[in-house]
Amino acid sequence: MSATDLASLENAIEAAFENRDNVNVSTRGEVRDAVETALNLLDSGKVRVAERGSDGNWTVNQWLKKAVLLSFRLNDMQIVDGGPGGSTWWDKVPSKFEGWGENRFREAGFRAVPNAVVRRSAYIAPNAILMPSFVNLGAYVGEGTMVDTWATVGSCAQIGKHVHLSGGVGIGGVLEPMQAGPTIIEDNCFIGARSEVVEGCIIREGSVLGMGVFIGKSTKIVDRATGEITYGEVPPYSVVVAGALPNGNTMANGQPAPSLYCAVIVKRVDEKTRSKTGINELLRD
């Protein structure tokens, strides 16, 4: 699609979103066509909700988020086949894999093991591996990335190349509660088991989060080497573990106030870290 066509599509989505109270399951014509086109572009990876520039800054394509939201007003509830034991689900969003056969899977080039759930408009790049996991609509999963068992990739989240999302990891979405920007995990990151990254936070390239690290916009991220406290973004090649900051205050009963949770940057990634968190290429052959 040309830049001119994309601009026209964006304008159509923006206009429909401004008039969203009048958009419903009976809506036909330009609005429905524009939303369907936007979702198909997301599904194929030809467009993304957010894109990283050469300067490292991310640009959010808000109009694509709006297209995802409009789809909920346009689509009625329907039976979704494929449940265990021949059961069905009841939803507005079909499976990405609906109607796929062997040729389509081979063309897509990723692995999806039984009980991997991907909603339509999410993109999965070649050589990615989906264990029994959940990838929500509008998300982007990069080449060679592993989404391990019971990990969840939230709506419109951006996962880079050669990332490992360990078992039970949660990557937050943007649709509810509504966030300005998607949660982003850049290339070559390792996210430890049961960790959560939410609220549009960014984990920069090559970083490693230990098991059970929780990062939201209000989470203090403490650099142990400098004492600097930041929010919302982990610097490149950081090794981060769960920690606690002393409160320093005294409660009314005279006892020390409880320490508060924080994420601690304990060091930068080194060869020892890489040897423990490296991607196993044998799994991607």
Curated annotation (Swiss-Prot):
PROSITE patterns: HEXAPEP_TRANSFERASES (PS00101). Gene3D superfamilies: Hexapeptide repeat proteins, Tetrahydrodipicolinate-N-succinyltransferase, N-terminal domain. Substrate binds at R111, D148. One of its GO terms (cellular component) is cytoplasm. One of its GO terms (molecular function) is 2,3,4,5-tetrahydropyridine-2,6-dicarboxylate N-succinyltransferase activity. It is an enzyme of class 2 (transferase). It comes from the Bacteria. SUPFAM superfamilies: Trimeric LpxA-like enzymes (SSF51161). Its main location: cytoplasm. Pathway: Amino-acid biosynthesis; L-lysine biosynthesis via DAP pathway; LL-2,6-diaminopimelate from (S)-tetrahydrodipicolinate (succinylase route): step 1/3. InterPro entries: DapD_Trfase_Hexpep_rpt_fam, Hexapep, Hexapep_transf_CS, THP_succinylTrfase_dom1, THP_succinylTrfase_N_sf, Trans_hexapeptide_repeat, Trimer_LpxA-like_sf. GO terms for biological process: diaminopimelate biosynthetic process; lysine biosynthetic process via diaminopimelate. Keywords: Acyltransferase, Amino-acid biosynthesis, Cytoplasm, Diaminopimelate biosynthesis, Lysine biosynthesis, Repeat, Transferase. The keyword Transferase applies. It catalyses: (S)-2,3,4,5-tetrahydrodipicolinate + succinyl-CoA + H2O = (S)-2-succinylamino-6-oxoheptanedioate + CoA. Its EC number is 2.3.1.117. Belongs to the transferase hexapeptide repeat family. PANTHER family: 2,3,4,5-TETRAHYDROPYRIDINE-2,6-DICARBOXYLATE N-ACETYLTRANSFERASE, ACETYLTRANSFERASE. Homotrimer. This is 2,3,4,5-tetrahydropyridine-2,6-dicarboxylate N-succinyltransferase. The gene is dapD.
